[in-house]
Design a protein with these regions (language model features):
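Short Fe-S-cluster ligation motifs
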Residues: 15-41
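Conserved AdoMet/S-adenosylmethionine-binding subsite of the radical SAM
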Residues: 45-187
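Canonical Radical SAM [4Fe-4S] cluster-binding loop centered on the CxxxCxxC motif
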Residues: 1-14
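Alpha-helix C-cap/termination motif
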Residues: 26, 30, 60, 126, ...
Length: 273
């Protein structure tokens, strides 16, 4: 992964728009589209064509657009202006303390946490749509009392429409990132201001509904976006432990690349950039 704060047209905007138009040209989609969600292998707000892409999607589809962002670039006026075209913006704020923020998110050195919080707060004041602040918690990393107190103060400053609490997936593939229980998240939710919801999934899938993973369908899925092993298991209804083992085998064989982002291991095609 490249750690940077430099905005560029990393992929030609025209190519992205052409792919969107190709998708919209299919009248009978497998699933009707309710909302277009813009995310990225890296960070959407680093792309200088973001505003144009959002506006194009809305004009062509008539559907609302949500943008997932790590929030690191929201101190910039140009980024805040481009995000105005969206309907929902979901920035991450996994910690409001510099020490635990660095540990869980491993941000680029150019990212300033105070600037980031101030930028998200300013955007909330200017934005007519919805802002949902997502917080990813990991046990003994960013869930301690001083972390929650700092987070509480930041939320009061930001004033988002929602706060969404999540935790790392179970079983975690990284030794240092352990999940919180539902009880842990409920306790923390009770300490935070505003409209707080727990979005972490603790449901267990029925074992007899699981399928064995097939490399072909997984590689096809990864052509669309990077995924974690639990993402793949959930989306394709695959047995989780077998899926994790297969992904490790595919990585060892060079058929997929591994990358770590926000404490989670993602897989992508080897030719992705």
């Amino acid at each position: 992964l490249i750690h940077t704060c430099e905005r560029q047209e990393y992929t030609p905007t025209a190519e992205i728009i052409a792919e969107i138009d190709e998708l919209l040209s299919h009248e009978n989609l497998a699933k009707p589209i309710d909302v277009f969600t813009i995310t990225a292998m890296g960070e959407p707000t680093l792309h200088t064509g973001l505003g144009e892409i959002i506006r194009h999607i809305k004009e062509k589809s008539g559907k609302p657009v949500a943008v997932l962002t790590n929030g690191a670039m929201m101190h910039r006026a140009d980024v805040r202006q481009e995000l105005q075209a969206a309907d929902i913006v979901i920035p991450s704020l996994d910690s409001a303390r510099a020490e635990s923020f660095r540990k869980i998110d491993r941000p680029a050195q150019c990212v300033d946490l105070d600037e980031m919080i101030e930028g998200i707060a300013l955007f909330c004041q200017q934005f007519s749509g919805q802002v949902w602040l997502e917080v990813m918690l990991a046990k003994n990393i960013n869930d301690q009392p001083r972390d929650i107190e700092a987070l509480k103060e930041a939320i009061m400053r930001i004033k988002p429409d929602r706060v969404q609490l999540n935790t790392v997936v179970r079983p975690p593939l990284e030794n240092f990132a352990k999940p919180l229980t539902h009880e842990d998240l409920s306790r923390i939710a009770g300490q935070l201001p505003g409209n707080v919801e727990i979005i972490a999934s603790f449901a267990k899938r029925e074992h007899d509904s699981w399928r064995s993973p097939e490399p072909g369908e997984i590689l096809e899925m990864l052509q669309r976006r990077p995924c974690t092993a639990p993402d793949i298991s959930e989306a394709l209804n695959l047995e989780p432990a077998q899926t994790s083992r297969l992904m490790e085998e595919l990585a060892d064989q060079g058929q997929v690349l591994k990358m770590i982002h926000q404490g989670r291991t993602y897989y992508q095609p080897p030719h992705a950039h």
